[in-house]
């Protein structure tokens, strides 16, 4: 499997705090069957403003750590970019990375961003010649149960990603993110998802869940669909090919 959304670099955002935590995440991801991970540390003005130099420096250390986990574990560079005009300017100047230096960039918004703002932001990115991969589409209230809006964004030239955890079945009690799991299922059932990725941050509250999600999708939608969402489409993204 190929995971294009992850927080594996230590001490740069709300992901791992130490080299040891980074290594534990990589090892668990590998155990689940992931062989390529794109590191997408947060870039968000006012919340995650770690200098690019430090992110790059720590990333290179994580790439070395990956060699200790397995010879065939590949770590690529990227970013999860919270959309602002500042981020748009940095993308234009190539000051923040796309996914593995491809045409694709992982873009996020706040849960409560209006559809108009989402549409405008993604249009602005497309005008730079960059193809947005919309991070965890199940989070956005403006897209909830709205096939028309998601199709409109796809028709514009965007791609969509959902988190592996939200593929799993909601628990009966105490499930904080039950509504996101329902949204993810809605999008999957309508064939509105291009990629499933982990968005892993740590082993305690936000582990990978990739193997579990793969198995659920293979069982419910078929092995071909699972391969498309976890292997084929992510590979095309990091190889800078059209999906």
From Swiss-Prot:
EC number: 3.1.3.48
Superkingdom of the organism of origin: Bacteria
Enzymatic reactions: O-phospho-L-tyrosyl-[protein] + H2O = L-tyrosyl-[protein] + phosphate
UniProt key word Hydrolase: yes
Presence of the UniProt keyword Manganese in the record: yes
Cofactors that this protein relies on: Mn(2+)
Keywords (A to Z) from UniProt: Capsule biogenesis/degradation, Exopolysaccharide synthesis, Hydrolase, Manganese, Protein phosphatase
Stored SUPFAM superfamilies: Metallo-dependent hydrolases
Molecular functions (GO terms): manganese ion binding; protein tyrosine phosphatase activity
Record-level GO BP terms: capsule polysaccharide biosynthetic process
Enzyme class: hydrolase
This protein's pathway: Capsule biogenesis; capsule polysaccharide biosynthesis
PANTHER family per UniProt: TYROSINE-PROTEIN PHOSPHATASE YWQE
Task performed by this protein: Dephosphorylates CpsD. Involved in the regulation of capsular polysaccharide biosynthesis.
Family: Belongs to the metallo-dependent hydrolases superfamily. CpsB/CapC family.
Protein name in UniProt: Tyrosine-protein phosphatase CpsB
């Amino acid at each position: 499997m190929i995971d294009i959304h992850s927080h594996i670099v230590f001490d740069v955002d709300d992901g791992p705090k130490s080299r040891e935590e980074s290594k534990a995440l990589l090892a668990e991801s590998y155990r689940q069957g992931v062989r390529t991970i794109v590191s997408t540390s947060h870039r968000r003005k006012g919340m995650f403003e770690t200098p690019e130099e430090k992110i790059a420096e720590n990333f290179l250390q994580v790439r070395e750590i990956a060699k200790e986990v397995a010879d065939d574990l590949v770590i690529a560079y990227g970013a999860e970019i919270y959309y602002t005009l500042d981020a748009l300017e940095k993308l234009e100047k190539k000051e923040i990375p796309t996914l593995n230096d491809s045409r694709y960039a992982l873009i996020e918004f706040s849960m409560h961003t209006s559809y108009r703002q989402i549409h405008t932001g993604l249009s602005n990115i497309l005008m730079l010649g960059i193809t947005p991969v919309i991070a965890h589409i199940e989070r956005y209230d403006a897209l909830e149960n709205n096939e028309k809006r998601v199709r409109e964004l796809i028709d514009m030239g965007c791609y969509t990603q959902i988190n592996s955890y939200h593929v799993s079945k909601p628990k009966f009690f105490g499930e904080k993110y039950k509504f996101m799991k329902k949204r993810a299922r809605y999008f999957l059932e309508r064939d509105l998802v291009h990629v499933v990725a982990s968005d892993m941050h740590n082993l305690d509250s936000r582990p990978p869940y990739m193997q579990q999600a793969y198995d659920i999708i293979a069982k419910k939608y078929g092995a071909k669909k699972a391969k498309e969402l976890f292997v084929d489409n992510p590979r095309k993204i990091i190889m800078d090919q059209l999906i």
